[in-house]
C-alpha cells in the first residue's frame, strides 16, 4: 500500500499528465491567429478545382453545397458519383451551372475510388475536397489559399461549425460541441508544433501536384489495416502522407473561413461517433507505432492528441484523481479537505470539461443548460470508444441512408490475398483498376519519407506486382 506521501505524488503525477496539455493548449488556442490574406496573392479562385465525391442522387442539401461553392467562383467543380446516379446529377449540374460543374462516375460507391477518378482530371494548382453537406462562406477561397504562399504548405483546412436549427435540443448541442472542440484542438496543436490529428474531409485544400504524384496514388489505393485493404479513413491517410513527406499543414480558424455543416441530430449521432472513433484508433495507432516520426516531428501533438486515443478515459481518470486526493489528505483538517475537493471539483467540471466550448457559450449563452448533458456524454463516450476498439475491422457508416449496404462495406475493407497467391484479387472493380506496373522507386510504404520522384519518363526500371505492396 502507498503511504500518504505516495498517494500525494500519485495524485500530482496523474493531475499533471492529464491536465498539462489542457493548460498549454488553452494558451496556444487563445493566442492563435490565422494566416492573413496577402495584398498581392499568388493564388486565386481560378487556381482551384473542387472535387465533391457523393452517393446522393440530388436533393436540397447537395444543391445547396454546390451553389455556395460556386459563389466563390472556382475554376471548376467535379462531381464524382456512381454510374447509377449520373443521369440525376447531370440534370442537377445543368440546372445550376453546366459550364462549371462536371460529372464523373465509378461503378461502385467508395470515396477513395471516387477521389482517384477525379484527381487526374484536375488542371489547376489547388484541389479542394468537399463533402456534400457543407455550406461555404463567400470569402472562403482567399482565406484557404493564403497559406499556400508558403511553398512548404501542402494542405489547408478551415474551422467548422454545425448549422444551428430554429429548435435546439441536446443532440444538436452535442454536434456543435464536437466541432467546437475539434476547432480548438487543431488550432492549439498547429500553433505549437504544426501538427493536428486529421485534416477534415468536409473541406480541405491540397496542392494538386501532391495528389497527382504516382507514389501518392499507389499509397492511397493500397493502404492496409492488418490483413485487410482499407478504403475508409481517406482524410486520415492524406494527413499522414503530408506529414511523412515533409509538407506543412495549415488551418484558417476565422469567421470568414468557417464552413457550416450538418450532423445527425438523433440517436444516429452515436453511429457517427463510433465511425469517428474507429478511424481515430486506426490512424493514431499507425501514426504512433508504424510511422513513428510523429514522436520527434510533432511531439506535442502526439502527447496532446494522438496518445489520448489510448490513455484518455474520462471516468477512470476522474475517479482516480478524487480517490488519490482522498487518500493523500487523510491527515489534513476537515476544512482543508473540503477546500481541496471543492477546488478539484470546480477544476474538472467547471473548467476542463467546458473550456473548449467557451466560444460556443459566448455566442449562445442559453446553451449553458446543456452542460450536464455534455459532461455525461463525455463519460458515455468512453463506452463508444471501447466498442470502437474491439470492432476496428468494421467500417459501417451508420448514419447515412444507402451507405451501409453489404457491398459498400465489403469495398471499404477487403481481405488481402496471401503473398504469392494465385487467387483472384477481390479488390478489383470493373471501373477502377489498380496499377499493375509500378516504378521501383514508388515501392515504398505510404509512411516513408522520401523525395518526390523524378518524371516517370526518366525511369527504366519497373516491377510487376500481383498483390498490393504492404508491410
From Swiss-Prot:
What Gene3D superfamilies does the record point to?
A: Spore Coat Polysaccharide Biosynthesis Protein SpsA, Chain A
Enumerate the subcellular locations listed in this protein's record, separating them with semicolons.
Cell membrane
Transmembrane residue ranges: 4-24, 305-325, 339-359, 368-388
Q: What is its main location?
A: membrane
What does the UniProt function comment say about this protein?
Glycosyltransferase involved in the maintenance of the outermost surface of the fungal cell wall. Likely functions in the synthesis of a currently unknown, potentially minor but widespread, extracellular or outer cell wall polysaccharide which plays a key role in facilitating many interactions between plants and fungi by enabling hyphal growth on solid matrices.
Similarity comment: family membership: Belongs to the GT2 glycosyltransferase family.
Q: What protein name is recorded for this chain?
A: Type 2 glycosyltransferase
Q: Which organism is it from?
A: Zymoseptoria tritici (strain CBS 115943 / IPO323) (Speckled leaf blotch fungus)
